[in-house]
């Protein structure tokens, strides 16, 4: 059953699903297996956990629908780097370094400890992909905030 595709109830048996979670390896969640999760800090949002450390991942990622007046004042956390990508709709984002309005294809990367405030903008719902993980430093490099839109990136051949 899923709130995203309107499929409710179970296929044939109670708790029957085609989703597969192999702890520490992978998770494949079919559309009928997507459920809403109650996560503190999200107001007027539908949040689905796609992957998390409790599933064996080294990160957490989410599919978020932000409704009017919705958002989260603090996505990320101490020691966590975070990333938000706008699948559709419009949001405003703000961290210690940048404030921007993101539309479809827009994204923000925020370095460890620099949380992102997310707020609905425009009309209609906004759909986001959100990702966070424990930051692993690389000697000689430091992370910085990046705000851009994939639609502004020139196409280039990937495999040569």
Task: Give the label of every model feature segment.
Residues 68, 92-96, 100, 118-120:
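Long compositionally biased, domain-poor regions of proteins
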Residues 1-45, 61:
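Transition-metal
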Residues 34-73, 154-160:
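A short glycine-rich, His/Asp/Glu-containing loop-to-beta-strand
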Residues 83, 96-113:
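Short acidic-glycine-tyrosine-enriched beta hairpin
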């Amino acid at each position: 059953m899923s709130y995203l595709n309107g499929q409710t109830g179970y296929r044939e048996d109670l708790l029957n699903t085609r989703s597969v979670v192999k702890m520490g390896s992978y998770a494949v969640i079919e559309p009928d297996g997507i459920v809403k999760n109650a996560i503190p800090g999200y107001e007027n949002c539908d949040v689905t956990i796609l992957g998390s450390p409790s599933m064996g991942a080294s990160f957490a990622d989410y599919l978020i629908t932000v409704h009017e007046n919705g958002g989260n004042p603090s996505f990320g956390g101490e020691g966590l780097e975070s990333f938000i990508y706008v699948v559709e709709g419009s949001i405003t984002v703000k961290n210690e370094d940048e404030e921007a309005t993101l539309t479809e294809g827009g994204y923000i990367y925020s370095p460890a400890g620099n949380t992102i405030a997310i707020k609905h903008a425009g009309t209609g719902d906004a759909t986001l992909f959100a990702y966070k993980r424990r930051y692993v430093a690389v000697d000689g490099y430091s992370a910085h905030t990046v705000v851009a839109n994939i639609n502004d990136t020139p196409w280039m051949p990937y495999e040569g």
